[in-house]
Amino acid sequence: MMGRDVRTATEILLADLDLPLTFDEYDNQATELKQIYFGMAMMMPGAERLIRHLNVHSIPIALATSSSKQMFEIKTAAHKDIFGLFGSITCGDDPEVENSKPAPDIFLTAMRRLDNGLEPEDCLVFEDAENGVEAARSARMSSVWVQDLRFAGDGPVESMATEHITSLLEFDPVKYGLPAYD
């Protein structure tokens, strides 16, 4: 489900669980719960350190999430200081993103919005969803797949990623020509 647009993920869930609800019925019932529980979202271990490190070294960073803008705002409300360090934030319901992951649209849009002349080959994507790794590859960007072992898949995604780790704490920026952690 990770890396899919909200409607597609919800429709898969409803079908798999054989629930007699439409997307809109489910969405209306789930909105209140999402606001409560998504508001308690924690950052991945190592994420804050990496974001602050890149910011201190003036390395441009963008965020491209399949989440809707509304859900992104709820999930990140407790971390505004960190998410304020991104030069570009692109959500899955952004009108400039025509196709959701695994299409490369969201990454290319986020890169363009940095407005600093980057080419896809200059970018490194951190991705926790298989669709996102595939999207990064389609965009011709390197990717670090931060696999959440709770959602382990059996697809070919590992061979698509430039690197495969299970925690951002394992990431070594020097491997990608970036400054070492202090």
Model-derived segments and spans:
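Asp-based, Mg2+/Mn2+-dependent phosphohydrolase catalytic module
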Residues: 52, 68-182
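Metal-dependent phosphoesterase signature
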Residues: 11-52, 57
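Short phosphate-binding/catalytic loops that engage adenosine nucleotides
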Residues: 57-59, 141
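A general structural signal for well-ordered alpha-helical segments in protein cores
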Residues: 6-10, 23, 27, 47, ...
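Hydrophobic/aromatic residues within well-ordered alpha-helical segments
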Residues: 2-6, 26-30, 68, 82
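Short, flexible loop segments at the rims of nucleotide/cofactor-binding pockets, characterized by
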Residues: 37-42, 66-67, 143
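Helix-loop "lid/cap" segments that line or gate small-molecule binding pockets
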Residues: 5-20, 75, 110-111
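Conserved SAM-binding loop
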Residues: 43, 61-64, 125
